[in-house]
């Protein structure tokens, strides 16, 4: 499970991870990926369509999760997963035999805001990004993870 605020590098990490043979067949669960497909299909920006497609993206996410879980496939959760409550809810849906790992992305607020400025069509209002930064709780093994890894940006 990837954990970190927007702009921290989670999706870039997934792209690199998928090139490693062990992870190449893993199912990547990402509402952002679904939204990006709709961006391409509709020729609009992420921000322009977000409110219109987030419910569909969430449904697609759940369908993909259930299929992957039922098939026993490796799953990479590519979402913010900012709080203990959010992560525990997701972990509770996994069968007990699943190996549970958390990779969290440590980034300064200044760097996140700087990166946010360069995101064309996917800009997050500063107030929201700041709120998410302050909401973020570093994952621990007490939440049910077998291991926790930090990636410092």
Which residues does each PLM region occupy?
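Hydrophobic anchor at the beta1->P-loop junction of P-loop NTPases
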Residues: 2
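Conserved glycine(s) of the Walker
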Residues: 9
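The conserved Walker
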Residues: 5-6
